[in-house]
């Protein structure tokens, strides 16, 4: 199943390091495109604690009063408050109320309450969220630890080598893509044989090369092995610790953690998947998942409705080859029922940028004439005004074509893939031009 999007910082790092020598190169980003469950930082910290990995003392608060109470419980005069938003760049982000920074150092319970009240219930805008931002519903308050050394360590699933890898760098505590761009030799990849796992020798070698002091190497080795254990036992696709620190009292601590889990493992990881925060996800993508559709928004203006991930990718490719931009990835799967088609059209047309829809269906499991009935009824009931290009190939395709032609609906039935894609791009441009100059446009079918 084609899935988009992993941690963007990692993706940038993959791309940047593809130019580095093989020994220090991260896996290629083209091999890494995955869409997986992400969980909040405070939940990641809880999971690390369960496996005996050192993390700063802290807890989650959903009100200013709770934040104040947690800060009192932690004690001391050095703490950090972090907005719980599933996006990178929180520290440099800005809230919709003008507050700068989603990660701030605080020195008292009073400050904890003050900043919590300014963060909770407001949207944080970062370089990853886009202008719309993401709602902060909770804050994580933890003790501030001072590090003697900071490192970067991640356990990832690498499709190129068809197995897990450990990516490490002595330059932790900073933007990993910046390190990858400026100094790719500082990033190292260790390939793991799943039949052997992370041995003592391998983990100790990684810890030593990172630069942990002699008294911390064994604890760092144990931490690396525990991270790999979490990776395997919880069906993770990504565990990123940045920074993994050696504190001033020579303790190994995971100061910040990002987890990604394989969406296909939800049936055997119920405890993990109940941690999902759908308020942090695109509502249309959540709705699609509930309907059994694989839907991911993109930035273009040609809607795509396809059955099968491979055909969906080929459809997006040929749209781009003809000068267009797909507005979405949408795979209705083998069960392209009339109900699924209607749901798919509602999702596609909810995007105001969409100026044409390309329906590309191969009728193997489902008959093309059944698809045609669903398509015609959907276009009628939704009273769609934008052009629809339908390419229905396979079982009963002639009957499907006849149904569309006899329907009187403005659906362009085209058999050839190139011609259908070309027509989609051309009609999309016409509609976009009409919108730009604020005039109406109608289409007459040449059939």
Swiss-Prot record:
One of the record's GO molecular function terms: ATP binding
SUPFAM superfamilies cross-referenced by the UniProt entry: Glutathione synthetase ATP-binding domain-like, Succinyl-CoA synthetase domains
Residues that coordinate or bind substrate: 307, 364-366
Subcellular location: Mitochondrion
InterPro entries given in the database record: ATP-grasp_succ-CoA_synth-type, ATP_grasp_subdomain_1, Succ-CoA_synthase_bsu_CS, SUCC_ACL_C, Succ_CoA_ligase-like_bsu, Succinyl-CoA_synth-like
Keywords: ATP-binding, Ligase, Magnesium, Metal-binding, Mitochondrion, Nucleotide-binding, Transit peptide, Tricarboxylic acid cycle
Pfam families xrefs: ATP-grasp_2 (PF08442), Ligase_CoA (PF00549)
EC number: 6.2.1.5
Reactions performed catalytically: succinate + ATP + CoA = succinyl-CoA + ADP + phosphate
Family: Belongs to the succinate/malate CoA ligase beta subunit family.
Subunit (UniProt): Heterodimer of an alpha and a beta subunit.
Alphabetical list of NCBIfam families matching this protein: PRK00696.1, sucCoAbeta
Name listed for the protein in its UniProt record: Succinate--CoA ligase [ADP-forming] subunit beta, mitochondrial
Organism listed in the record: Neurospora crassa (strain ATCC 24698 / 74-OR23-1A / CBS 708.71 / DSM 1257 / FGSC 987)
Species classification: Eukaryota, Fungi, Dikarya, Ascomycota, Pezizomycotina
